[in-house]
Amino acid sequence: MSDSENEGPPQLSSYALAALQEFYAEQQHHHSDLCGDDKYNIGIIEENWQLSQFWYSPETATCLAEDAVAAAGEGGRIACVSAPSVYQKLRERHRDDVSVCIFEYDRRFAIYGEDFVYYDYKNPVDLPERIATHSFDIVVADPPYLSEECLRKMSETIKLLTRGKILLCTGAVMEDAAAKLLGVKMCKFIPEHTRTLGNEFRCFVNYNSGLDCNLSVQLPVQEGPK
């Protein structure tokens, strides 16, 4: 038997071992965040640009969430279709006030349990039986791609889910297509993202919305956790 066969398994240097321990600690901390109340923080699940994911700023997500709550009414049902930032704000601020579902292609959002509904816009009406048609007071939707095909297919889903009210967030270039497909009009409010986008982004609604009052929306004061 050679000397090399007697050496045993390779040993990590103290530097490599410390780096590995730090990595495991970070992973454990991240896992703890995903299991606790912090799982509703925007950015707790990182953007995947390959899926065209760009999160709203906390201020914008809050404005959209509050407008959706006002539109849905007390005890209302809200569907967030490809709009996870809005879902997270709804759950953070109105955990007991409204019922919310998050429709997402990205299965990482399955951490939200029964709220999560797997959704692929390419199969717009392929939804689980537990999701009844026209069962949501408002649908908040953000098509992942700026194309008429994507908007047209997602519009099928929106019309299948909503009882009437629609809050659509997409590029300004989709204004005519959005009006044609969903009967929505552009709001004055200008949404912002955590990263600067190359295209002008706007909100569109088909109801009397606070988002249409001003370019910046006054955020309501929250009286303690809910």
UniProtKB/Swiss-Prot annotation:
The modification Phosphoserine is found at residue 2. Pfam families: N6-adenineMlase. Its EC number is 2.1.1.-. One of its GO terms (biological process) is peptidyl-lysine methylation. The modification N-acetylserine is found at residue 2. Belongs to the class I-like SAM-binding methyltransferase superfamily. EFM5 family. This is EEF1A lysine methyltransferase 1. It comes from Bos taurus. The gene is EEF1AKMT1.
